[in-house]
């Protein structure tokens, strides 16, 4: 008896999707120090795009809007005039 072994193959290779398969690296934005935390001068407090949080007392703002401590002290997140601010207050010696 004659047996047929019929196999069908693709005549074109499967094309990969070119619109998918890419994603950007996470930028690690957000708070780097929490409220009440003791930080040293130059420590990064908050990384952001734009001014979501504004610099308060003893806090500077970098070129990319990163907030950093100017002095050693305690971090305090607070509202001033309806906007969020982060400040660093020096530790009071007892």
Curated annotation (Swiss-Prot):
Any one GO BP annotation for this protein: translation
Alphabetical list of SUPFAM superfamilies matching this protein: Ribosomal L27 protein-like (SSF110324)
Molecular functions (GO terms): structural constituent of ribosome
Keyword annotations from UniProtKB, A to Z: Ribonucleoprotein, Ribosomal protein
Coiled coil: none
Segments of this protein annotated with the region Disordered: 12-33
PTM: The N-terminus is cleaved by ribosomal processing cysteine protease Prp.
GO cellular component, as recorded: cytosolic large ribosomal subunit
Family matches, as InterPro entries: Ribosomal_bL27 (IPR001684), Ribosomal_bL27_CS (IPR018261)
Organism superkingdom: Bacteria
Pro-peptide region(s): 1-9
HAMAP family: Ribosomal_bL27
Family affiliation: Belongs to the bacterial ribosomal protein bL27 family.
Protein name: Large ribosomal subunit protein bL27
Species per Swiss-Prot/TrEMBL record: Lactococcus lactis subsp. lactis (strain IL1403)
Gene behind this protein: rpmA
């Amino acid at each position: 008896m004659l047996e047929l072994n019929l196999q069908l193959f693709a005549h074109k290779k499967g094309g990969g999707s070119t619109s998918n398969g890419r994603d950007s690296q996470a930028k690690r934005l957000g708070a780097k120090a929490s409220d009440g935390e003791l930080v040293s001068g130059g420590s990064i407090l908050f990384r952001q795009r734009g001014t979501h949080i504004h610099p308060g007392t003893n806090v500077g703002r970098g070129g990319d809007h990163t907030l950093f401590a100017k002095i050693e002290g305690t971090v305090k997140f607070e509202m001033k005039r309806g906007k969020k601010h982060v400040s660093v207050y020096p530790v009071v010696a007892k």
